[in-house]
C-alpha cells in the first residue's frame, strides 16, 4: 500500500537523524519527543518546517543552526524535496516537488478510507469513560457534548492504532437513585388511579417516569401502594434504574453511540471492590486513619473531629487528604470512585475520563488517586467539557416542563438531526463554552460550518453527473502534472490530514478534525468559485479533457479526505444538496 507524504517525510527525517548519529554529530538513543514537522504559517517559508535541529541541539548542547545546516544538507538530497533552507534560530524549511504533491493524490486514491490512519498507538489499550449520566432521567443537552467528544475521541484513537474501550459508569448507589425510586412510586400510585396532585417536593417531576409507574402497576397491582418504604424501595430502585438506563441507551443510539462496557457503582460496592482498593493502599501507607482539619470559614456547631480513613492525596499534589469513608463507615463517593479507577486500570494502559466542567473541583483528587493506584505507570487524563447554551434565533430556549425542566437530547436530534448535533459539538475546544442555536445550525450559509463542509462534499459528488453530461470520463489515471498552482495548494491542505489526525490523537482533542475540515472545505469552495468567472477554471471543462480529468481526480481525493474526517467525528457525509 502506498504511504502518505506525511509518513514518508517523518521516515526521511528519522533516517537523516540516524545518519547524523552514525556520523557522531548526534548521540544515539536521544528522546525525539517534541520533534515536529508542520506546515508553516507563511507559504513563503516553504511547504513544511521542522524544529528537529533545535530540539536535538538542546539535548546535545550543540548550536542549533549548525545542526540545522547538517540536517538541511541531507534532506536536500531526498527525492521528494525541491529545496531546503535554514531560518531563524534553527528551523529547517522544506519545499517539496510538485511531483510529491501529485503523488499524494494517488496515495489518497489507493488508501481510500484508510488515508490518515496511523500506527502510533502501537496497540495500547485506552479506556475512555464518557457520558456516565446519572440514571435519573433521559439524556439532555447537558450530557450531549461530553458524549460526542468522548465518542469522537474513541474513533480518533482507534484510527491511530489504539485498542479502545468505551465505558459508561452507572451511578446507581447514591441517594439520588433512592429519590428516583420514590418518584417512580408516586407515578405507580397515580397509575393505580390515585390523585396525588403535584409531585412532592424533592422528587423528580418529569413525565418520563409515568411509563415506569404504569409498568410497575401492571406488574405489582396495588401490592406496594400503601406498603412501608422498606418493602418496595430496593425493588422500585432496581426497576427504575433499569428503565432509565434503557432510555439512555436509546438516546445514545440516536447519536450513533454505543458503549463496550457498563460498570455499576452498586455492583462495585457489592463485590467488595472498595475494600480491596483500601487494603491495597493501606499496604503502601497511602491510606491512614486521621482527622481532617475543620472546614474553612465559620465552623458549624455540629462539626466534630472524627477519625476517618484518609487517602494521602497531598502526596500527589492535592491540597488535602481525602476521606474514603463516612463517619458511619459507608463509602464516600470518592472512596467508590477510587475503587472504580483501580478496576479500570487493570486491563488498560491509559485511562481517560470525560467530565462536565461542574466537576472541575474533584479532578485533582482523582488524578492523585490514579497516580497512586497505577504507581505512576499509566497515563490518566481528565477532559472537562463546558456547557452548551441552547438558543433559537439568538434567544434562550425555554425549558421543557414535560421533561422535568430540561430539553431532551432526543427532541434536539428529532429537530435538526444527529449529524448536525455531532458536528456542532466539535466546532469548539471542549474546554470552551458554546452556543447551539437551532436556527443557525441548519442555515445554508458559509458561516455555518456543518453546511459548509457538507456542501463541499455534495459539490464533489455532483461532479460525477456534471462530468458525464459534459462527456468527460476519468478512465485511466490522469496526467496530474496538468494541475496548476491553485490546485496543488488544495492538495497541500488535504495532505495535512494524516498529521492533523496524529496531532489530534496525541492531544486528545477531536475538535481539531472539525477545524481541519472547515479549512479544507473553504479552500475547495474558493477553487470551485473561480470557475464562476472563468469557465476554463471549472473542474468539469469539456474543451480541455486532460485538465478536466486531472481536476476531477483531485476533487474525488478531496471528497475522500472529507469523508474520512467526518467518519472520525461520527458524521454521515451528505451526497446531494439543492445548491450543489
Protein language model features and the residues they cover:
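Non-catalytic interaction-recognition regions
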Residues: 1-104, 110-580
Amino acid at each position: 500500500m502506498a504511504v502518505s507524504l506525511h509518513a514518508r517525510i517523518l521516515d526521511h527525517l528519522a533516517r537523516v537523524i540516524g545518519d547524523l548519529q552514525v556520523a557522531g554529530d548526534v548521540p544515539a538513543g536521544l528522546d525525539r519527543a517534541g520533534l515536529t514537522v508542520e506546515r508553516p504559517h507563511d507559504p513563503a517559508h516553504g511547504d513544511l518546517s521542522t524544529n528537529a535541529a533545535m530540539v536535538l541541539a538542546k539535548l546535545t548542547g550543540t548550536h542549533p543552526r549548525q545542526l540545522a545546516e547538517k540536517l538541511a544538507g541531507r534532506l536536500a538530497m531526498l527525492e521528494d524535496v525541491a529545496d531546503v533552507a535554514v531560518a531563524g534560530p534553527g528551523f529547517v524549511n522544506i519545499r517539496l516537488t510538485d511531483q510529491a504533491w501529485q503523488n499524494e493524490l494517488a496515495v489518497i486514491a489507493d488508501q481510500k478510507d484508510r488515508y490518515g490512519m496511523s500506527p502510533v498507538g502501537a496497540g495500547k489499550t485506552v479506556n475512555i469513560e464518557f457520558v456516565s449520566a446519572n440514571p435519573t432521567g433521559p439524556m439532555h443537552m447537558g450530557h450531549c457534548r461530553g458524549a460526542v467528544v468522548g465518542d469522537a475521541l474513541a474513533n480518533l484513537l482507534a484510527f491511530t492504532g489504539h485498542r479502545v474501550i468505551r465505558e459508561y459508569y452507572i451511578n446507581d448507589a447514591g441517594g439520588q437513585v433512592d429519590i428516583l425510586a420514590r418518584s417512580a412510586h408516586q407515578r405507580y400510585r397515580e397509575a393505580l388511579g390515585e390523585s396525588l396532585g403535584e409531585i412532592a417536593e424533592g422528587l423528580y417531576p418529569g413525565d418520563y417516569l409515568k411509563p415506569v409507574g404504569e409498568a410497575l402497576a401492571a406488574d405489582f397491582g396495588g401490592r406496594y401502594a400503601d406498603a412501608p418504604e422498606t418493602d418496595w424501595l430496593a425493588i422500585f430502585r432496581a426497576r427504575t434504574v433499569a428503565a432509565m438506563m434503557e432510555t439512555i441507551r436509546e438516546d445514545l443510539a440516536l447519536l450513533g453511540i454505543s458503549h463496550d462496557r457498563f460498570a455499576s457503582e452498586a455492583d462495585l460496592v457489592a463485590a467488595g471492590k472498595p475494600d480491596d482498593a483500601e487494603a491495597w493502599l493501606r499496604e503502601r501507607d497511602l491510606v491512614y486513619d486521621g482527622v481532617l482539619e475543620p472546614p474553612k470559614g465559620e465552623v458549624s456547631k455540629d462539626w466534630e473531629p472524627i477519625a476517618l480513613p484518609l487517602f494521602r492525596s497531598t502526596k500527589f499534589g492535592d491540597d488535602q487528604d481525602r476521606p474514603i469513608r463516612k463517619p458511619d463507615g459507608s463509602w464516600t463517593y470518592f472512596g467508590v470512585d477510587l475503587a472504580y479507577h483501580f478496576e479500570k486500570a487493570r486491563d488498560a494502559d491509559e485511562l481517560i475520563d470525560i467530565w462536565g466542567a461542574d466537576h472541575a473541583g474533584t479532578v485533582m483528587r482523582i488524578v492523585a488517586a490514579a497516580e497512586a493506584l497505577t504507581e505512576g505507570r499509566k497515563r490518566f487524563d481528565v477532559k472537562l467539557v463546558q456547557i452548551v447554551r441552547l438558543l433559537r434565533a439568538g434567544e434562550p430556549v425555554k425549558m421543557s416542563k414535560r421533561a422535568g425542566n430540561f430539553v431532551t437530547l432526543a427532541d434536539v436530534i428529532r429537530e435538526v438531526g444527529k449529524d448536525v448535533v455531532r458536528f456542532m459539538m466539535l466546532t469548539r475546544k471542549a474546554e470552551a463554552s458554546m452556543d447551539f442555536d437551532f436556527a443557525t445550525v441548519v442555515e445554508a450559509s458559509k458561516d455555518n460550518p456543518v453546511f459548509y463542509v457538507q456542501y463541499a462534499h455534495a459539490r464533489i459528488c455532483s461532479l460525477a453527473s456534471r462530468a458525464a453530461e459534459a462527456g468527460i470520463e476519468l478512465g485511466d489515471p490522469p496526467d496530474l502534472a496538468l494541475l496548476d498552482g491553485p490546485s496543488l495548494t488544495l492538495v497541500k491542505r488535504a495532505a495535512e490530514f494524516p498529521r492533523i489526525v496524529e496531532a489530534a490523537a496525541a492531544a486528545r482533542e477531536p475538535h481539531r478534525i472539525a477545524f481541519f475540515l472547515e479549512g479544507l472545505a473553504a479552500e475547495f469552495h474558493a477553487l470551485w468559485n473561480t470557475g464562476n468567472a472563468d469557465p476554463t477554471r471549472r473542474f468539469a471543462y469539456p474543451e480541455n479533457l486532460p485538465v478536466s480529468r486531472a481536476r476531477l481526480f483531485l476533487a474525488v481525493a478531496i471528497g475522500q479526505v472529507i469523508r474520512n474526517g467526518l467518519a472520525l467525528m461520527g458524521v454521515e457525509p451528505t451526497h446531494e444538496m439543492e445548491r450543489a
